[in-house]
Amino acid sequence: MEIAAVIPAHLASRRLPRKALIKVAGKTILQHVYERVKSADKISSVYIASSDDEIIEEVRRFKADFIKTYRYHTSGTSRVAEAASNLNAGIVINVQADEPLISPELLNQMAAQMVKDGSIKILTPVKKIRDTKEIQDPNIVKAVFDKNLNALYFSRLPIPYESGETYKHIGVYLSLIHI
């Protein structure tokens, strides 16, 4: 089954404008994300989806594939959906453009799980919060799920809980595509 990754990128981020083009260790955050996703061996193809000419120019500079999208998307997910409609992939991975440390092994594990278990339609990872300051941080998306690990909701606000454990979302989504 063809597995494609799409990295939605734009310059108008509300919390940190132009973050995709910020340089870290000599490369843009976007290039770091692309290279890590590209190194996941279960992913057949990687595209950057953007409407911003400056991002497209940067993508061309580091020789990545891209899909030019509609300018007025309200979310990265809608940008990925537009890009995915132009692809011939059974599974599409949405990797946020601000995840420069995304683990290629995590992407491989998620892709393998999605292929193995045909009942999964959407898959997204979470990680236990160990630093209690992250619970109050609106930049950290907290996740709530049921006993079967089905997501119930996500929030930037602290989540009231009884278990004493809080989880944060990692900016990756795998979706099974029916064309």
Ranges and model annotations:
Residues 47, 53-97, 101-112:
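Short phosphate-binding loop-to-helix
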Residues 15, 101, 174:
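Short aromatic/basic micro-patch
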Residues 8, 123-125, 154:
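Short glycine/serine/threonine-enriched helix-capping/active-site loop
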Residues 2-49:
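N-terminal glycine-rich phosphate-binding loop and ensuing alpha1 helix
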Residues 177-179:
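Conserved small/polar residues in nucleotide/adenosyl-binding loops
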Residues 128-171:
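Anionic-ligand binding region
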